[in-house]
Amino acid sequence: MHASRASQRRSCRSELRLTFAPSPLAFAPMALDTLEKLRVAVRDVPDFPKKGIVFKDITPVLSDPVLFHASIDLFLDRCRGRKIDKIVGIDARGFLFGSAVAYELGVGFVPIRKRGKLPFQTEIASYSLEYGEAEMEMHIDAIDAGEQVVLVDDLLATGGTSAAAAVLIRKAGGQLLEAQFLIELEFLHGRKQLEPTPVISFLKY
């Protein structure tokens, strides 16, 4: 009976992993076609969340199974074959990509959240965003000293939230290998905030 249950669990895990099998789209005559489809799917929303801001809305990518899969594969292609202990995602859209990447790699996922959203003892770092000021936090036991970490988020703008995340990772003793973003707004020069961390982005505006 126990063996049967274990067999069922293994079968269930196998079926679940199939849903994250490499997308044929991701391996097409390289990603130029894929990237263009992703670029077209990202929707500009003017004056959100404040007047004068053009918000990059990724929900059309998330709602399309092929495009969502392709976007995850972009991150995975940067991570496979490397020694990575944890994937860190930034509240909130970084969770959507980071947790899927961590699952596929078989490593832990660490959420960095806005202050007041985590229940246990935290480290805190402040940041400036193009539309305000805020603080981010991470559980003090989320990353062990010496662990190799990749930061994943949907968008790099001014670099404030990402820089705060990098501070938290390093406070914990983690080694930040790379910061990866689906979208980068190059005119805001956010990657300067992350120096000397290598920055990778797939869709540049």
What are these regions (language model features)?
Residues 2-4, 8, 12-205:
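PRPP-associated nucleotide enzymes
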